[in-house]
Structure formats: C-alpha cells, structure tokens
Amino acid sequence: MDRAGLEDHIRANPVEGSPAEMRAAFLRLAHPGGPPDLPPVDSVGGCDGRWFGTGGRPIVWLHGGGYVFGGSDSHAAPARVLADLTGRPVFVPDYPLASEHPWPAPRDAALAVLTALDRPDVVGDSAGGHLGLVLGMSRPHQMRRLAVLSPNTDRSGQSTTRTRNSDTDLMNDDAQDRRLSDMALGHLPDDDPKASPLLGDTSGLPPLLMAATTTEVLLDDTLLFAARAARSGVGLTLQVLPDLFHMWHLWPAATPEGRAILRAVADHLA
C-alpha cells in the first residue's frame, strides 16, 4: 500500500463510537491487510503484553490510542521494525484502558513494567508519549533513554495547532483528542502536571528524542515541551517532519517517513 492508498484507508475507517467500537476500529485501521500474526501474550511486572524480537537490553513501547484504544496488537508493525533495527527485544504492554480504567491505572501498570525490566529504554507515541514523559519526569532513574512521537503534553490551552491543524490531520482532531483525554484524565485539573506534563519539572528527564509533523494537531504539544526541556538542560533531539498525519509511524511499510523515524529512534537508543 502506498501513501495515497493509506490515506484512503484512514478516511474509510474512522475511529468513533463506544470504547469497544473504537478499539475494534483502531485495530482495523492499524492493519490494512487484515489481522497480523502476533507473538504470544506474555506478562512483565504483572502487566500483559507482547515481545517483538530478541536480543539484549529491552525496549518498552508505550502505545498510543488516547488511553482508550490501542495495544500490542495495533502496534505490532512499528514494534517489529524497531526490534529489527536495534537487534533488541521490544515489549509492548497492554496497560489498562479507559473508560473502564482511568488514570492512574495505565501509569501504575507501566511503572511495574519498568521496575521489572530494570531501566529499559522507553518509546511512547501519542498518549503513550504522555505516559513516557510523566514517568520520565517522576521516575527518571527507571529508564535509560526516552523517545516520544507526537506526545500529548498540554491540556492548559497553550497549543494553537490543536485547532489550527484539526483540518489537516487525518488521524486526529482537537474534539476527539479532548474526548479521549476526558475519559482517561478528566478527573485531573488541566494544570496538573500529570495531565499536562508541559507544566511539570522537566529537568530530570533522561536523554530525549521528540518528533512530530507540521500538519498534526499535537505539533505544539511537542514544540512547547521540547523548548521547556531544552531550557532545563535535557539532552534533546527534536525532529519535525513536513506534511504528515498523527501516528504516521504506525505504517512503516506504507510511509518511508514512518520507517525513517523508527531508524532515528533506534539511533537514539543505541
């Protein structure tokens, strides 16, 4: 499938409805060719998930999906590519999802995984990027390096691209992003750093790679956080890619930019 075909597939498969309906829709969206072959479910730190690849120091991929959908099944393709590029095992935990399990359930499950694996490298995309940043800020000693792709970092209203890019982002818009965030984090004030990591103390973060695209809703969430992290002395690598939709890396076989950012993540974690 090429880029045009992928964009048609995204338009034809909106992720909407109840949490159960969104989970099924996102899984169809993630795998245009049908359900993938998956490794068996394993458990790390009491959290189920799947390992992709084998080798040395583990990598934990905290998946996106607004804390409502997504999992080790939806993120099989990028996890496999990252495992191949690094020659290392990638564990994608199936942390508890909202609305059934709002915050702090996903944080607690992810923290148990990091504790069990003894300072792994961590990757997170979208809500998983938010999760990675919250853990990196509160428990920096429990990860070695961190890479986040289009993370949610701000509910306080500082971002302008949440509205400006809602018409140019095939995969996300501000209304949907807020709906998902309210389901998972709505009981937290918008200025709580657990809801808005942008407002927290970034000074203790491990070496950090951040990436986003110019036309996605969460561009400013990335740029504003990157600027704050840089000011606090964090070792930072920032990549901004032109003219792509949110979660472009989910289809590395269809987007050269998807594989390229996974190569950048692999280099950062080397």
Indicate where each model-derived feature is located.
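A glycine/proline-hinged amphipathic helix-loop "lid/cap" segment
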Residues: 1-52, 270
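Alpha/beta-hydrolase superfamily serine-hydrolase fold, recognizing
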Residues: 13, 44-50, 54-270
